[in-house]
Amino acid sequence: MPLHVPLLLAILLVAGPALAQAPSPDSWIADSKTGCKIRNPAPQPRESVTWSGACPNGIAEGTGVLQWFDDDRPTDRYEGEVRDGWENGRGIATSNVIADRYEGDWRDGWRHGQGIYSFDNGDRYEGEWFEGMRTGRGTMVWADSSRYEGQWLDSKPNGQGIYTDTGDAVYAGTWSSGCFREDGRKMAVGTTLKECGFE
């Protein structure tokens, strides 16, 4: 999914990989000044875009800046590599709607590969991504100084990992969809104790 859907920088952290799909024939938007086309699988009313880079065959390509607008007001911005109209390669995404920032690898409009996501509330994730989700190895440090380091799946701790809470209590071992239970100790990260079946 491209980054320009309002609040998408945050939304994709909880959205599932099932959102990935081949673009439909009308999934493009054109820079009104140059006519250069950019992929747009989730069109929004009143949105527009500008592209500062090359445009072979009428499609955005190479390195440049994609600036998205909502009713002529700047919203999301991507600076980096584009291939076949998609964010592809290395790039930085920021938003005027929320103060989140992502810097890292992209594939077909998704955060995919290695990257750093800084949230407007002070939280920070650094690690692997798969189709917009924290998946693989990574470290999340929350603004309150709690942290999780280890394996992730679909933006939740999953596999081997270590969570340290604000009181320096450590939960090290095997996690499943954000749930931890070992030796009578229970913890939930990115979910709730109730959703884990612990209450």
Model-based region annotation:
Residues 1-5:
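Positively charged n-region of N-terminal signal peptides that target proteins for export
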